[in-house]
Design a protein with these regions (language model features):
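Catalytic center-proximal scaffold of phosphoryl-transfer enzymes
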Residues: 1-312
Length: 313
């Protein structure tokens, strides 16, 4: 409330509800702190230095952590929104990567599409984590992934990442001297070029022609790469070579490998999910690990929000 000294008019305004003390940090300070530590992956000590050197404002690591906790709590409604957004999407990308929490092996799980990103940390890589996320058990769309078998229990259809196939085929060619793998790599890249030129999807005639060539390469590959080949001088049953494992997988999941040429929304790769989790690897290179599961959950929720906000701008 303020009274004008000249005319005597009294002006009143609503007191900010977030202000509860005589002196406290404003939202701009909190937002900047959270963005630097969680968005830009800057360690707490360096965030302290930034505020001290640039703003002449002392912030302790404990205060920075409290700001992150507050951001986590305020984003609880967003957490439900992103899960609903993921469930509505006809296509989602999934991936997971190792995470060090308190010196123990854990996992960061990612589910994302062109609009929404959801990260979640868990000690389990498989079903326990998927169940706790409360998304995939109810999902009915297409899942794009890197052939992690647990995902095959969810979604209605699947699409496999051909970037991974290309790398595996190159290994077969270079290390196992397989010719079929060279031909398969060339075919997959050729199909991808054709899909791009066609605007995202091939007609049924072209699909059929490519499927025949795909099957022929695999059939010839079986002669070149037999099951459990005998190794001279070695007794007992020999392990099946990696090249044959790959061949069998490409045959068994042909529909999922080639789905990108049949469904326009399905991409050639799972690169979207891989890009999403890349910053987690950067965080661990900078900071080493997460001290607690709570810290990992804060990181995941804030990163989910930042990634989603950038996509819907």
């Amino acid at each position: 409330m303020k009274e004008c000294a000249k005319c005597g008019a009294v002006t009143t305004g609503a007191y900010p509800t977030e202000v509860s003390k005589a002196v406290q940090y404003g939202n701009s300070v909190k937002v900047l702190s959270v963005y630097l530590s969680q968005g830009q992956l800057i360690p707490y000590k360096r965030v302290e230095e930034f505020f001290k050197d640039e703003l002449n404002m002392p912030l302790s690591s404990g205060t920075i952590y409290k700001f992150n906790q507050e951001a986590f709590e305020r984003l609880s409604s967003f957490d439900e929104q992103v899960k609903e957004g993921v469930l509505r999407s006809p296509l989602n990308h999934t991936d997971e990567t190792g995470l060090n929490i308190g010196g123990k092996r854990s996992w960061l799980h990612s589910i994302s599409n062109e609009t929404w990103t959801l990260f979640y940390p868990h000690t389990s890589r498989g079903k326990d984590a998927i169940a706790e996320m409360r998304v995939l058990p109810s999902y009915k769309g297409i899942l794009c992934h890197d052939y992690y078998k647990a995902y095959y229990e969810y979604g209605s259809l699947h699409a496999l990442c051909n970037s991974h196939h290309i790398r595996e085929l190159e290994r077969c060619t270079e290390q196992d001297n397989q010719n079929w793998s060279k031909l398969m790599k060339e075919l997959l890249l050729e199909i991808n070029e054709a899909v791009i030129k066609a605007g995202g999807k091939l007609d049924e005639l072209e699909q059929g022609e490519y499927q025949i060539r795909y099957g022929t390469i695999l059939s010839n590959g079986k002669d070149e790469c037999p099951l459990n080949p005998k190794i001279p001088g070695k007794r007992g049953k020999t392990a099946q070579p990696k090249s044959r494992n790959l061949l069998d997988r490409l045959e068994r999941h042909q529909e999922d490998v080639l789905r990108f040429m049949k469904v326009s929304i399905v991409p050639f790769t799972n690169n979207l999910a891989e890009r999403d989790i890349r910053m987690t690897k950067v965080h661990q290179k900078i900071s080493g690990c997460f001290r607690s599961l709570e810290g990992a959950k804060i990181f995941c929720r804030v990163r989910s929000y930042i990634s989603t906000a950038k996509r819907i701008q």
